[in-house]
């Protein structure tokens, strides 16, 4: 889609200077580079560029959350993890052998973005990855709704852009549910935790409505699946009785905390509950979402097409897809 847009854009612009030597090779029928990352039987891989990229601005796009891709290790089929995608990204950069004029990485879901701070003896994987890409010659890193954009402090002299999609969320939601009334009496924005506060504050300021938030009480004495389990969600905010509620966050991982927040809002007599999240990972599947939709705890789940989404999701009655590029 990006390639088609560039081809169309350059076909319809600067027609009057096509003979200028400054615009040699400016127009082309294809801007995609033929590349691959084949693997050996042991699972090891290599990056291969099948055409020259010398002197070009190279843009590498990667979806580190696309688990639908597989490879074989000693006869066993493995699904690709974010670590595998990140390694392939570095392989393609290495295959360029420093010949590209500039290397730009477009990574919609920032690799390891949730591991952006240290609270105990643990690795700072996101900062480490950014430093590694910078050391390999990457000029710009483009991402969307980074979990914490301040992680760019790891590479203060390099380009780092994190684009947020609040306008696209509102446009998609208001088109899907046109009877939403954006005023203080009928709508409220809720942050599911303290980390998403800045998103909720922006939404509420733009719409001119009130905001509430939940904070998580955790059991710090135990670790389950790499994190301290949530004991309860406590709500801070005005009365939600009869109001439609929009819950905003950067991602749905398992969805457990998001669904618990939606349930608590309905128990507080909220009207309809809409979930807006940039990345729908759905790591525990859709059974719980189906159940909560049937019980009326959630009405819509709006997520972007910035990461891979399984085909079964498109059949869900509560699902609303947000296109961050021109829709087909």
Mark where each language-model region is.
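Conserved small/polar residues in nucleotide/adenosyl-binding loops
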Residues: 323-328
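A short, conserved beta-to-alpha structural element at the edge of catalytic cores
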Residues: 109, 216, 222-225, 263-297, ...
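Short, polar loop motifs at secondary-structure junctions
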Residues: 146-149, 196, 304-309
């Amino acid at each position: 889609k990006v390639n088609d847009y560039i081809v169309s854009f350059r076909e319809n612009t600067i027609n009057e200077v096509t003979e200028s030597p400054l615009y040699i090779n400016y127009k082309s029928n294809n801007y995609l580079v033929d590349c691959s990352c084949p693997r050996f039987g042991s699972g090891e891989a290599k990056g291969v560029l099948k055409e020259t990229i010398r002197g070009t601005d190279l843009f590498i796009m990667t979806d580190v959350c696309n688990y639908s891709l597989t490879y074989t290790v000693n006869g066993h089929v493995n699904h690709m993890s974010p670590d595998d995608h990140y390694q392939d990204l570095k392989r393609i950069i290495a295959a360029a052998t420093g010949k590209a004029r500039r290397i730009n990485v477009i990574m919609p879901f920032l690799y390891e973005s949730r591991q952006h701070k240290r609270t105990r003896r643990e690795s700072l994987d996101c900062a480490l990855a950014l430093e590694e890409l910078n050391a390999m010659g990457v000029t710009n890193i483009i991402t969307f709704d980074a979990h914490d954009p301040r992680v760019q402090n790891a590479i203060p002299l390099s380009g780092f852009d994190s684009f947020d999609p609040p306008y696209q969320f509102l446009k998609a939601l208001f088109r899907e549910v046109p009877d939403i009334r954006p005023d203080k009496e009928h709508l409220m924005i809720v942050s599911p935790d303290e980390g998403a506060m800045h998103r909720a504050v922006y939404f509420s300021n733009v719409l001119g409505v009130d905001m509430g938030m939940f904070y998580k009480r955790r059991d710090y004495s135990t670790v389950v699946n790499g994190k301290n389990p949530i004991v309860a969600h406590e709500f801070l905010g005005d009365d939600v009785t009869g109001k439609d509620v929009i819950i905003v966050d950067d991602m749905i991982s398992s969805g457990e905390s998001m669904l618990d927040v939606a349930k608590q809002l309905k128990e507080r007599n909220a009207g309809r509950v809409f979930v807006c999240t940039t990345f729908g990972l759905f790591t525990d599947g859709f059974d719980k979402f189906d159940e909560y939709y049937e019980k009326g705890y959630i009405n819509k789940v709006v997520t972007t097409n910035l990461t891979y989404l399984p085909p079964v999701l498109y059949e869900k009655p509560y699902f609303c897809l947000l296109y961050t590029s021109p829709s087909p």
